[in-house]
From Swiss-Prot:
Residues 111-135 are annotated as: Disordered. Residues 120-129 have a biased composition (Polar residues). The modification Phosphothreonine is found at T125. The keyword Translocase does not apply. GO terms for cellular component: nuclear pore central transport channel; nuclear RNA export factor complex; nucleus. Interacts with MEX67. It is found in: Nucleus. This is mRNA transport regulator MTR2. It holds the Pfam family Mtr2. Its main location: nucleus. InterPro entries: NTF2-like_dom_sf, Nucl_pore_RNA_shuttling_Mtr2.
Amino acid sequence: MNTNSNTMVMNDANQAQITATFTKKILAHLDDPDSNKLAQFVQLFNPNNCRIIFNATPFAQATVFLQMWQNQVVQTQHALTGVDYHAIPGSGTLICNVNCKVRFDESGRDKMGQDATVPIQPNNTGNRNRPNDMNKPRPLWGPYFGISLQLIIDDRIFRNDFNGVISGFNYNMVYKPEDSLLKI
């Protein structure tokens, strides 16, 4: 029995698991309605050289994209369906092709549970109708959209270093269900 071969297979399986877990972490960040956690997500992106594309629209900086996602996209729920990754030899870089699906809250409310069409008044501190964790309305999930996500990430994720590892992020909706209320 060749122990080198076993180590290689074990290493590949471990890398595949780490890559899938990292991808799930990215999707969980996109689904998180808490805007205070935005800083944790920004740290994953390379601050000097990162390309972000969302449905053929480029973004110059990760913070601009993430603020748009937080403020203009309703609550989401992603489900990972497949991850395929390839290491580029000698570059320390991985190319990940991610297949997933996402559904959107079609209740007409934003991520904070407020009516998406009526802005909240900032001086209503005693408003009892304001949602909190206990009485926040539940999302009304629509049908799933198909998503294709391409990531360019550093292989430092295999050494448990996640700061600035994303240098490419290309998020595309490849399937839109006909019965969705959402217009994209």
